[in-house]
Amino acid sequence: MTTLRIRGGRPLQGTIRVGGRKNATLPLIAATLLADGTSRLENVPQIHDVMVYRKLLTGLGARVDWDPVHGILTVHTGGVRPGEPDYHLASSIRASYYLLGVMLARYGEASVPMPGGDNIGHRPVDQHFKGLSALGAEIWMDRGIIRARARRLRGAHVYLDIISVGATIQVMLAASLAEGTTVIQNCAREPHVVAVANFINACGGKVTGAGTDTIRVRGVDRLVGATQTVIPDDIEAGTWMMAAAMTQGDVTLQNVIPTHITPIMAKLREAGVEVHELGDAVRVVGRERPKAINVKTLPYPGFPTDAQSQMTALLSLAEGTSYITETLYEDRFRFVPELVRMGAQIRVEGRTAIVKGVEQLYGAPVEATDIRAGAALVIAGLAAEGETTIYGMEHVQRGYEKLEQKLLALGADVQMERQGAAVV
């Protein structure tokens, strides 16, 4: 158990660097197994899920070198063989399911435990199975293990019934070594989908259309290791932006791609927050209480569900009543009772949170139930009067690198307390 103690009421001030995007890094690490030789990933965030993936690849026979100072992960695939990854590790993170398509495409067989990750609602993997089956894979469940095999995958037309980042990437990875051409329709368009496609192409693959709703993958016989820099984390950037606004601070974020955070910037400006784009940096100034606004989560390029919890926290201090509608995951409001403990006035009706802004939040003991809920509680604690103790910070550390270090750099009064296993 990891606990964060926050003595709130201090405006955040200063400059920090945003790390690499978690949701790009994990599929990129999996994708290195598609290629012969050595691949090098740069700007890799030092977070728990990356360390889990490193151990998963090592267990499959890869040699993985990690340079935490420079954020460089190097994967040598010469020793990789088909096998079943460690159950405890693989079932602890959702992104372990990318190993299914990768190992199936490269070795003709794969075994992966049912994925874990945050408990934010129903996130079925049926679209992954549908896509891989269309490519010719035989897939079955065996006592909590997903097993798949195919002599060689063959290109096919795959229509995804729902827009799914995971399924889009899964099919794209598997199709890269399939025989023939695969057309994937109703694709997710997130920048990390594009990042994975770019890596496949750098390795010698033939992927076009990433970033649109239709992706074409012409399979090749062999991929060779390549180097890629992980794109900045849009959700980390958005979290710090909302923290600056909520504490009425002045924070500059380096290593950002403003076009990737357009909906977050737009909503902050609508709420009266100053947002200045400075090339590959963004400055956020919160001079007064935010104004109430309405927010609806949507697939990219809409407002991201992963930033909804933090926006809800921010709007709990807004002037007026805000309506926040969550269209993607039904359990994204599980953190609301924790905010209410701090004095927020929020009522949830179905998939909409009705947030009546208050002038002040107050420190309280609260619990983080997932990555983004925990981030919301952190920024609420920073703005609250008195001391907030957040339990379950190990969830948050799955997605935010060097959190305590960055908070201290911005002038926050915080202390991380660790019990049991060390936190990476």
UniProtKB/Swiss-Prot annotation:
Its EC number is 2.5.1.7. GO terms for molecular function: UDP-N-acetylglucosamine 1-carboxyvinyltransferase activity. The active site is at 118 (proton donor). It catalyses: phosphoenolpyruvate + UDP-N-acetyl-alpha-D-glucosamine = UDP-N-acetyl-3-O-(1-carboxyvinyl)-alpha-D-glucosamine + phosphate. It comes from the Bacteria. It holds the Pfam family EPSP_synthase. Coiled coil: none annotated. It is found in: Cytoplasm. UDP-N-acetyl-alpha-D-glucosamine binds at residues 94, 123-127, 306, 328. One of its GO terms (cellular component) is cytoplasm. The keyword Disulfide bond does not apply. The keyword tRNA processing does not apply. Pathway: Cell wall biogenesis; peptidoglycan biosynthesis. Keywords: Cell cycle, Cell division, Cell shape, Cell wall biogenesis/degradation, Cytoplasm, Peptidoglycan synthesis, Transferase. InterPro entries: Enolpyruvate_Tfrase_dom, Enolpyruvate_Tfrase_sf, MurA_subfamily, RNA3'P_cycl/enolpyr_Trfase_a/b, UDP_GlcNAc_COvinyl_MurA. CDD domains: UdpNAET. HAMAP family: MurA (MF_00111). Cell wall formation. Adds enolpyruvyl to UDP-N-acetylglucosamine. PANTHER family: UDP-N-ACETYLGLUCOSAMINE 1-CARBOXYVINYLTRANSFERASE (PTHR43783:SF1). Belongs to the EPSP synthase family. MurA subfamily. This is UDP-N-acetylglucosamine 1-carboxyvinyltransferase 3. It comes from Symbiobacterium thermophilum (strain DSM 24528 / JCM 14929 / IAM 14863 / T).
